């Protein structure tokens, strides 16, 4: 499929495979884009999808994984504060930094998806992977994704370690 680009696959490092779908390449409507993304997501034990038409991200992995793509947008100060943990409310954390604010939200959305049901997690209690130390947090890894300009993309996953049994 020429409208699908593989964004991430590091052989031997137990990382997920991530694909970017661009509906503009083959003139897909939203419904067909979503159906195509669902079809791509059957390749692993776990999968995650995110949509911001005309784009979709799909991640497949043998362990937990979450992916998110967001269009960079302006943030109202009250809305921005409603997604931050107390530790994220630093002077540099400003809603006027639209890409940073969108990246905080996208990273939290990807993490919540990797944990299970994103609706179960309050963003004010979920630390953004954007602020994690290098190497991740515990067993979790996270990375930004090279998505089209004007968008932010994140992936969070649990890497498989040597000796991990796949059922």
Write out the residue ranges for each language-model feature.
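Core catalytic alpha/beta fold that binds nucleotide/phospho-ligands
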Residues: 1-167
């Amino acid at each position: 499929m020429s409208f699908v680009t593989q964004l991430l696959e590091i052989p031997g490092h137990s990382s997920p495979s991530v694909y970017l779908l661009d509906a503009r390449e083959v003139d897909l409507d939203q419904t067909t884009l979503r159906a195509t993304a669902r079809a791509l997501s059957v390749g692993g034990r776990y999968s995650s999808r995110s949509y911001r038409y005309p784009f979709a991200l799909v991640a497949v992995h043998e362990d937990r994984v979450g992916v998110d793509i967001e269009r960079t947008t302006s943030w109202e100060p009250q809305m921005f504060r409603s997604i931050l943990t107390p530790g994220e409310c630093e002077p540099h954390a400003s809603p006027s930094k639209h890409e940073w604010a969108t990246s905080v939200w996208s990273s939290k959305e990807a993490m919540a998806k990797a944990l299970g049901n994103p609706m179960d997690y309050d963003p004010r209690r979920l630390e953004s992977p954007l602020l994690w130390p290098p190497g991740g947090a515990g067993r979790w890894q996270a990375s930004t994704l090279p998505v089209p300009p004007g968008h932010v993309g994140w992936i969070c996953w649990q890497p498989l370690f040597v000796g991990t049994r796949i059922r």
